[in-house]
Structure formats: C-alpha cells, structure tokens
Amino acid sequence: MNKLEKESVIGISALLVHAAKIDEIYSDHEKDLIKNFIKSYLENNDVDEALKKAEQIENNSNQLLNFTNIIKKNSIDIKKDIIKNLWKVIISDNTIDQYESNLMRRICGLIYFPDKECAEIKMKLINLK
C-alpha cells in the first residue's frame, strides 16, 4: 500500500474523529482505532501528536468533508483502507445510526468510491464482530 504524507494522515484522521463523534460519544476504543490508523501510515512517535491535531481540526472545522479531496487523490487501495477504518470506528459501538450512515454515503460519493464496495466492507466488518 502507498504511504500518505503526514498532513494527509492528520486530515483523514480528523474525518475519523468526526465519524467517532457524530453519535455524540467519543470513546477510548474509538481513539485507539484512530491511533491504529495513524500508526499504519506514520511513525509511532508521531501518533499522539497527529491525533491531537486531528481532534483540533475536527473541533474547529465546519468543512470536514473538504478532507475528502485528500482521499480522492489516492489509489483505490488507500481509499479502501480509509473506508474500512471509517466503518471500524462507526461500528465499534455495535450500532450504526442514521447520521453515521449518511456520513459514509456522503464521503463515498465525494471520493467516487462505489456504494457496493462500501457496503461490502461494512458487512465484512460487521460479520467479524
């Protein structure tokens, strides 16, 4: 899989934080999942700093979906990994509410990721739980 630049990882992580908070609960488990995503692209010593920056961006931004432009420019493998990580965060509490589903539909549409593949990723992760 290709690597992402640090600023791209932070921007995408802000989307992950947004997905985690959209149901108004931001758990330690969700933070750990986001840290795992960050670790897959950055050095271990950058993880806490990257998460902190991502949380600040999420807190201060009304335009989080602008970060989909970062995703859109990447390979299908990276897009799949990002979608998979978004779903991991969303289903970590064993529920998917309407806001979470809507967020995923919007993100997939904005990055030109096929709905069918998005649904397949979601179902695989649900079946693993």
Where are these regions (language model features)?
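Small-residue-enriched hydrophobic alpha-helices in membranes
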Residues: M1-K129
